[in-house]
């Protein structure tokens, strides 16, 4: 009954503001650019824009578009209106976009260049905007797209830049957008997060507000019944920080919830708790034998193509719009079924038994309550060689984690520049597993690695390298000081920590 009344109220609100719906506009400005030489070609780079393109075609800088739409509306078309066109001096041969390739493929690959595009005496791209879609974040309908302010004639080498671009999005009423309004949150923290994500936060004021419920709480823990009483230290930890916690079991959800399987019942329960009680965090207590995962489908267009229909993804439990399987087949998360804007934060304690759970709880509480202060500003970066064509290293991406950055279309504030950075970069020299172990043994708060991996291999280390004897200095500190190894290792690569394959 409560949700029926909510939907009725939202529909009435939308009727009142319908006269203001229909068109959303924003103007973007571009003044600075730089030209980078790459293997006899040129790359045109603009701060804050992502350099990309279709494989074999010119790689150009693209601006992201993230515009809040009127409540209950979806985006139906996008228009690019460029002005103050500036002709760049000289003639250019813009670098063709190359495909990503797994390390397992032999050789350096074939250099991709679409000759028909490069021989055409016409401006590229024919359409300046990318695909347009309507996404939803915490109840707000958002037009997602991109555009390039660059015009390029491959035949003549002429390049021009629009210094001002107006983007116009036309909207229309949509039932899916009305339904998404159920996910409007009363949390100021969530509203602030949405406002930082979008580019026209003033439009958010046209959305209905939601009052806090008397039953609101912050964090939900879902675990197996046998572990329900083992999370008190975690609950106390968060209560001390002003985060209220409730716990339930998968058995309760399975017996009382709705859905075709346990994973869907858990997701539906999370949706109810988010909409009715305002939760912002979910902790899944247990590995997949205790709390199931949802396997997603993906086809990667690289080389001969790679396909997987069972990629474990807890994003299913945090991105709460839609069903992730609109056509009810055996492929979850196909194109058009996905929801890549999560409403809440979801984490998982991947334990199988009580011993592992107690260890994870001990590490979690000790890390927050008793940090090793002398190591807090010590960080190790480990970057491998990634690809030859174009030449790419992990260090290219690791450097973007330091301080303020606005590369690739994202604005980030990373690890403070005042920290001590210990860098193992193959861009400047070789390094080995022994070098990385020495860094860990020296005491590092964060270890960030970008390279190649598999389910049993990472950072030049295999399963056999994870032995006590290889981390003797850490263990010596633990024995003498009754503390423990306090270090996070974060890795960006393919199938690392692929626990489903073990």
Segments (PLM) and residue ranges:
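Cysteine-dependent hydrolase recognition
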Residues: 20-502
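Positively charged n-region of N-terminal signal peptides that target proteins for export
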Residues: 1-4
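Bacterial N-terminal signal peptides
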Residues: 8-17
């Amino acid at each position: 009954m409560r949700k029926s009344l909510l939907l009725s109220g939202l529909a009435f609100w939308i009727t009142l503001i319908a006269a203001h719906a229909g068109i959303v506009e924003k103007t973007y400005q571009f003044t600075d650019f730089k030209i980078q030489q790459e293997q006899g070609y040129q790359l045109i780079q603009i701060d804050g824009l992502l350099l990309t393109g279709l494989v074999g075609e010119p790689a150009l800088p693209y601006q992201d578009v993230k515009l809040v739409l009127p409540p209950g509306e979806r985006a139906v078309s996008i228009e690019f209106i460029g002005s103050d066109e500036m002709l760049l001096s000289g003639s250019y041969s813009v670098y063709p976009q190359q495909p990503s390739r797994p390390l397992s493929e032999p050789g350096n690959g074939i250099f991709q260049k679409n000759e028909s595009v490069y021989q055409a005496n016409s401006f590229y791209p024919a359409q300046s905007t990318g695909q347009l879609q309507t996404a939803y974040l915490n109840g707000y309908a958002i037009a997602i797209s991109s555009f390039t302010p660059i015009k390029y004639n491959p035949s003549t080498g002429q390049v021009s830049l629009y210094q001002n671009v107006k983007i116009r999005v036309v909207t229309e009423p949509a039932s899916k957008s009305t339904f998404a309004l159920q996910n409007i949150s009363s949390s100021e923290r969530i509203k602030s997060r949405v406002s930082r994500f979008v580019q026209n936060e003033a439009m958010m004021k046209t959305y209905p507000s939601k009052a806090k419920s008397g039953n609101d709480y912050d964090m939900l823990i879902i675990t197996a019944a046998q572990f329900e009483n083992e999370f008190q230290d975690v609950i106390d930890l968060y209560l001390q920080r002003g985060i209220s916690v409730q716990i339930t079991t998968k058995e309760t959800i399975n017996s009382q919830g709705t859905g075709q399987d346990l994973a869907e019942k858990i997701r539906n329960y999370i949706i109810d708790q988010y909409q009715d009680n305002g939760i912002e965090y979910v902790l899944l207590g247990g590995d997949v034998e205790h709390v199931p995962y949802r396997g997603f489908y993906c086809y990667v267009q690289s080389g001969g193509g790679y396909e997987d229909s069972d990629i474990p993804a807890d994003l299913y439990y945090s991105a709460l719009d839609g069903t992730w399987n609109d056509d009810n087949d055996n492929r979850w998360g196909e194109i058009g079924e996905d929801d890549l804007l999560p409403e809440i934060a979801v984490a998982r304690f991947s334990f199988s038994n009580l011993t592992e759970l107690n260890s994870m709880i001990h590490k979690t509480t000790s890390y927050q309550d008793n940090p090793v202060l002398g190591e807090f500003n010590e960080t190790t970066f480990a970057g491998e060689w990634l690809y030859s064509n174009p030449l790419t290293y992990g260090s290219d991406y690791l450097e973007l984690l330091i301080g303020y950055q606005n590369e690739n279309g994202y604005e980030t504030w990373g690890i403070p520049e005042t920290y001590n950075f210990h860098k193992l970069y193959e861009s400047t020299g070789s390094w080995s597993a022994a070098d990385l172990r020495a860094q860990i043994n020296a005491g590092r708060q964060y270890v960030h690695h970008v390279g190649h991996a598999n389910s049993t291999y990472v950072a030049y280390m295999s399963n056999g390298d994870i032995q006590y004897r290889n981390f003797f200095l850490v263990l010596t500190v633990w024995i003498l000081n009754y503390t423990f190894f306090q270090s996070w290792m974060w890795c960006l690569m393919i199938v690392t920590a692929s626990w489903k394959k073990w």
